[in-house]
Amino acid sequence: MLLTWILLAASMPALQSSGDKPAKSTQPTDPTEPRRTRGLAYTHDLVEEVPWSIHLLKIDRSRVDYQFHTTMAKPSGFGLSRLSEQIKSVPREWGQPLAAINGDFWKDGRQYDGDPMGLQIKESELVSGPCARACFWIDATGQPHATNVLAQFQFTTPDGLSASFGINEERTNNGAVLYTPTFGASTHTKGGRELILERTGDSHSDWLPLGPGKNYTARVREVRDKGDTALLRDQMVLSLCPEWLQRFSRLTAGAVLKLSTATTPDLHDVNTAIGGGPMLVRGGKAVTFSGSQPRHPRTALGWNDNFYFLLVVDGRQSNLSVGMTFPELADYLVKKGCTEAINLDGGGSSTFWVRGQVMNSPCNGGEREMANALVLVQKPKTPGAPQTIDPP
């Protein structure tokens, strides 16, 4: 096995391209234990006998100036774009992007291309609701979590009728979806009934951007018996399927609805979350998987009390890397010290960006477009705060 590594400091320039060959070290230190003062350590592990090409970034959790954010493919509305393009859209106030990996699985379809399959919270905004897969989120104290999240989204009419709804997704033939301007220019729906919602007169009540674990009061501004309603600033649209028209026939302009974005567990104070799954490591032990376990390119996120671990395994390239099964991936993460780890979207989506360049070899020959990503940034210095400079 050939192991190569690079230590990264926030003050270092972007790494130079090394093609399929791992870059050579320039620092004489133990590759398995990065200096905590530097905060980051990248390793490229080549296991030639399989073969595997494994890219791992170890992040010191004591660095309070490091922070995770989620990105979207487009500046306005759902869609698809390459990871390197999403990095370019990171706002200056977040800080300097240091590393990024692809995020959640996403819906592939003309009208709803780029709809994340699971949960996404971006800067405290509930962009996409959870599904039946595991999610990763960071609570208000900075502690990471990963488990299934149950949506309890519900609207209630003035006469006491209640029903559940989804958020920013394709509406089914038996349900309701709440659309926000973050989704795009319009709802892309066909048929049914759509209620254009506006804030009530209370300017102090919660409104947009939509947040998790909150209660909202909304007034029906207009009722449309057509689909594809425009999504205007400071308005939401509640889209009802055709089968529900009779049930909610008494909803007219002026009606006031109660909306809840509750979840279990409660995510009301969460700033960053992203969907994925399945879980790979729990309590320091690899999760057990049954049935056929094929090898594919993989992306994963793990952690312990001291470090985060971002990992991408290349795959579907017989001369470089064949990919990993879930059990192989889980075992590898345990050996690296993870006590918790979650799988993210893989296959052609698996992409690893560090300090200005894509470090891995995506299986389609280049970056694939994706719906969202998880980005690590170094927060800007607080004006007047002592300057801390990483050693060269």
Task: Give the positions of each predicted feature.
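Gly/Ser/Thr/Pro-rich low-complexity, intrinsically disordered segments
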Residues: 10-392
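Bacterial N-terminal signal peptides
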Residues: 1-10
